[in-house]
């Protein structure tokens, strides 16, 4: 029973397939297409296995192609030479020119490229558009549509730079004046051969002169204010008044008397100066409680190191000797070096070391 049903189904399927094949043959004969040509194309499979038989038949049939849509474009009204615009009907071939162009891509077609290649390279003042460029030339070509920087920002930056230069020049002038004053003061001390005001023991003549001068000043000024700080010595000296002349004469007389006392008692000045220097050293020693109180606030500086662990030393740039920054740094170094020479650790400053390293000791063989 099953075999009989199967045979009936196979006969129906074969009859239907034969009917379909007969219909296809009749259609091909009606259109004048030989069946041998279709079988040859099907066996070769020029278009692969995905090529459908409907496409093959449609290609072989003498059918008229469908009309393609044409997009009509209005030519440019402000164009200088409208005859050179080329075809105004775009197609898919124009996509490459549009994608590779950055300026006015909607006004350029593929036909313009050939025309630009044929023309001689010349500049026309009324030429509005240029031909398409290659990608290499386009990368090297500077952009024309870059927005300029705001003028207000440029003006602010220029004003800040001018103000900074003015401040640097002022600081350099102040430091120069201070160096000049220090040099003149050092020359004055060298001429006297001793620091003024230290270890002087006035004689009887000097005391009499001082008493006379005090009485004269008290008659002129009834209440004398506390002595002011010594002013800085400037290069331009004011005109001397009679009071200044009298004071200078008294100072010269006191200097002569003190020199005589020094010749008679040479050890007195040394003892007084040593006593004063000891007092100054004791006052300069800081209190350890104040130092230890701020130990928790100390922050170490991060040091850049190489992969091997050695610290990296930055190269010192060579500055001009007239640079304000170099002048200021040089003056500060001289100032702090002068202070370190007068410090109580003068005998221990024989080497230069970091504040975290221990002093090097010389090894003596026994």
Swiss-Prot record:
Its main location: mitochondrion. Residues 149-177 form a coiled coil. It comes from the Eukaryota. The modification Phosphoserine is found at residues 306, 343. It is found in: Mitochondrion. InterPro entries: Mtfr1. GO terms for biological process: aerobic respiration; mitochondrial fission. One of its GO terms (cellular component) is mitochondrion. Residues 201-214, 351-366 have a biased composition (Polar residues). Keywords: Coiled coil, Mitochondrion, Phosphoprotein. Pfam families: Mito_fiss_reg (PF05308). Residues 191-240, 255-281, 305-324, 345-366 are annotated as: Disordered. May play a role in mitochondrial aerobic respiration essentially in the testis. Can also promote mitochondrial fission. Belongs to the MTFR1 family. This is Mitochondrial fission regulator 2.
């Amino acid at each position: 029973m099953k075999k009989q049903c199967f045979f009936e189904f196979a006969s129906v399927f074969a009859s239907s397939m034969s009917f379909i094949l007969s219909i296809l043959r009749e259609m091909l004969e009606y259109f004048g297409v030989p069946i041998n040509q279709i079988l040859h194309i099907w066996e070769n499979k020029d278009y692969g296995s995905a090529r459908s038989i409907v496409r093959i038949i449609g290609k072989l049939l003498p059918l008229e192609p469908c009309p393609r849509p044409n997009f009509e474009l209005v030519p440019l009204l402000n164009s200088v030479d409208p005859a050179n615009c080329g075809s105004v009907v775009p197609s898919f071939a124009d996509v490459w020119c549009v994608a590779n162009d950055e300026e006015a891509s909607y006004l350029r077609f593929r036909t313009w490229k050939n025309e630009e290649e044929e023309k001689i390279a010349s500049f026309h003042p009324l030429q509005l558009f240029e031909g398409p460029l290659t990608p290499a030339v386009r990368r090297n070509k500077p952009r024309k549509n870059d927005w300029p920087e705001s003028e207000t920002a440029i003006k602010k930056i220029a004003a800040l730079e001018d103000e900074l230069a003015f401040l640097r020049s002022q600081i350099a002038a102040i430091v120069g004046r201070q160096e000049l004053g220090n040099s003149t003061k050092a020359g004055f001390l060298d001429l006297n051969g001793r620091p003024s005001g230290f270890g002087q023991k006035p004689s009887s003549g000097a005391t009499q002169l001082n008493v006379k001068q005090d009485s004269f000043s008290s008659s002129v000024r009834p209440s004398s204010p506390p002595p002011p700080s010594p002013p800085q010595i400037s290069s331009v000296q004011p005109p001397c008044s009679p009071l200044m002349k009298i004071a200078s004469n008294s100072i010269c007389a006191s200097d002569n008397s003190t020199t005589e006392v020094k010749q008679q008692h040479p050890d007195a000045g040394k003892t007084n100066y040593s006593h004063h220097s000891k007092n100054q050293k004791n006052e300069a020693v800081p209190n350890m409680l104040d130092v230890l109180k701020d130990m928790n606030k100390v922050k170490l500086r991060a040091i850049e190191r190489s992969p091997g662990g050695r610290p990296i030393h930055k190269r010192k740039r060579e500055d001009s000797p007239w640079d304000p920054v170099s002048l200021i740094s040089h003056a500060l170094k001289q100032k702090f070096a002068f202070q370190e020479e007068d410090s109580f650790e003068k005998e221990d400053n024989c080497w230069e070391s970091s504040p975290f390293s221990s002093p090097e000791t010389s090894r003596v063989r026994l």
